[in-house]
Amino acid sequence: MMKRLLIGMIRIYQRYISPLKRPSCRFYPTCSEYSIQAIQKYGVVKGCWKSLVRILKCHPFHPGGYDPV
């Protein structure tokens, strides 16, 4: 239940909020897609933790690149 709610919220962000901003994610897959994959693979708690760590790495001083779940 919680997993579906979080993934739904991320999908809403991807569809309605993300297009309003310029592309800035330094990683592939994007941080929001990574978050969905992490929550699906690891569950809510560990998936959210991995998502938070990933989002904190997404800044101009990090090289980025391919970073799968």
UniProtKB/Swiss-Prot annotation:
Its main location: membrane. It is a peripheral membrane protein. InterPro entries: Membr_insert_effic_factor_YidD (IPR002696). Keywords: Cell membrane, Membrane. Transmembrane segments: none annotated. One of its GO terms (cellular component) is plasma membrane. Pfam families: YidD. It is found in: Cell membrane. HAMAP family: UPF0161_YidD. Could be involved in insertion of integral membrane proteins into the membrane. Belongs to the UPF0161 family. This is Putative membrane protein insertion efficiency factor.
